[in-house]
Regions:
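Bacterial carbohydrate/catabolite-sensing allosteric modules
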Residues: 2-193
Length: 193
């Protein structure tokens, strides 16, 4: 964001940091972060900010480098199908020197096929590994997925009001608005025993 730009967004970094602190409070020792496929979204900036928030919060919470697994975009995995992609991700997690006790994904859309593949490979969620998404879309509700909630409809309404005001030559009292997010606790996370 350039000073003076008008807009509305969430704080992706702070939101992901909230997720990391939550997982730390549950006693998770090894975290994995799985990026969103680059080719499926115009929101590359949000993905980058969420990854940065994950990395910085992990360090701030005292996680050592060997306790953090960051998986690159799924589009970097050589695969012919979506199942191949998620099989590849789970295989990499299984072969990691330390298997994660919790996995963060950059969007809920990644969590759904990942959850299916984790279960297919014998991992129990949340008993063996916790899983946290981001966005709180319909997928999250259907999967009982713990996730970071944002309100895209409200973001859109505020953006539309700002746009109309600018088109009418008005000066905005608040050019840039940062919208709140909240962690929605559901059935894919639990305290490490």
């Amino acid at each position: 964001v350039v000073d003076g730009d008008a807009g509305v967004a969430i704080d992706d970094e702070a939101s992901m940091a909230t997720i990391v602190r939550f997982l730390k409070s549950l006693g998770h020792k090894t975290l994995a972060y799985i990026e969103q496929p680059i080719n499926t979204t115009p929101f590359v900036c949000s993905d980058r900010l969420r990854k940065k928030g994950f990395s910085e919060a992990s360090q701030a919470c005292g996680y050592a480098d060997e306790d953090i697994i960051v998986m690159p975009s799924l589009s970097h995995i050589d695969a012919r199908s979506e199942q191949d992609i998620y099989s590849g991700i789970v295989a990499q997690l299984l072969s990691a020197p330390k298997q994660p006790t919790a996995i963060c994904v950059s969007v809920d859309a990644v969590a759904a096929p990942l959850l299916k593949e984790l279960r297919r490979m014998g991992w129990r969620v949340p008993q063996d590994v916790s899983l946290v998404g981001f966005d709180d879309d319909d997928t999250a509700t259907a999967l009982d997925l713990t996730t970071m909630h944002q309100d895209p409809a409200e973001i859109g309404r505020i953006a539309a009001r700002k746009t109309l005001a600018l088109l009418n030559g008005e000066t905005l009292d608040e050019p840039f608005t940062v919208m709140p997010t909240s962690l929605v606790l559901r059935g894919t996370t639990e305290r490490v025993s």
